[in-house]
């Protein structure tokens, strides 16, 4: 709220089947939304559900959009990167328009103890950072008005860590 212009563009990092891209597209003021994912299978699924949508198969952090956007959204993806904090700098410099924002949701972080065995049990790399390290990473990348909060907490689950930052 209050971080986007009345008309805005958006991209979802690690878009999977494109659910967030479709939801963004329906938001008042969204004039363009797209998604990128490293899984060709997931991009094909997104395209089959939403043939009119803009979905890109690309490996992050190397891939980047042709033009920057007002909103970069990422749910459950950034911790798969080797160095997500450096990627925040790339987002700030190359992906986000001045006045635009990033909104990130992560379930795998140090304080969420039930997520700490995911890397081993799924046999995939996951970068484990504390909530404070995630938040400080956004600040160090140059984002301002950085906020973080937890949502969906319940017994044995600390909730999703949500981070928001705005580019001046």
Spans of features found by a protein language model:
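A short glycine-rich, Lys/Arg-flanked "PGG" loop and its adjoining helix->strand segment in the class I
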Residues: 85-98
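Short, glycine-/aromatic-enriched active-site segment of Class I SAM-dependent methyltransferases
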Residues: 107-125
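Class I SAM-dependent methyltransferase SAM/SAH-binding core
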Residues: 11-62
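Conserved alpha-helix/loop element of class I SAM-dependent methyltransferases that forms part
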Residues: 1-6
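Core SAM-dependent methyltransferase catalytic element
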Residues: 150-168
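A conserved beta-strand element that flanks and buttresses the S-adenosyl-L-methionine
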Residues: 73
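Short alpha-helix
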Residues: 126-141
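Conserved beta-strand signature within the Rossmann-like core of class I S-adenosyl-L-methionine
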Residues: 99-106
């Amino acid at each position: 709220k209050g971080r986007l212009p009345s008309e805005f563009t958006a991209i979802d990092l690690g878009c999977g089947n494109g659910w967030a891209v479709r939801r963004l597209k329906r938001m008042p003021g969204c004039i363009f939304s797209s998604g990128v994912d490293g899984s060709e299978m997931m991009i094909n699924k997104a395209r089959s559900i939403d043939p009119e949508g803009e979905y890109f198969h690309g490996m992050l952090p190397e891939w980047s959009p042709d033009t920057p956007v007002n909103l970069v959204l990422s749910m459950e993806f950034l911790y798969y990167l080797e160095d997500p904090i450096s990627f925040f700098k790339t987002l700030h410099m190359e992906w986000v328009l001045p006045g635009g924002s990033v909104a990130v949701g992560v379930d795998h972080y140090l304080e969420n103890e039930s997520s700490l065995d995911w890397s081993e049990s799924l046999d995939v790399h996951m970068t484990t950072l504390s909530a404070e390290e995630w938040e400080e990473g956004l600040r160090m990348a140059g984002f301002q008005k950085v906020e973080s909060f937890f949502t969906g907490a319940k017994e044995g689950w600390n909730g999703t860590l949500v981070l928001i930052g705005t580019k001046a």
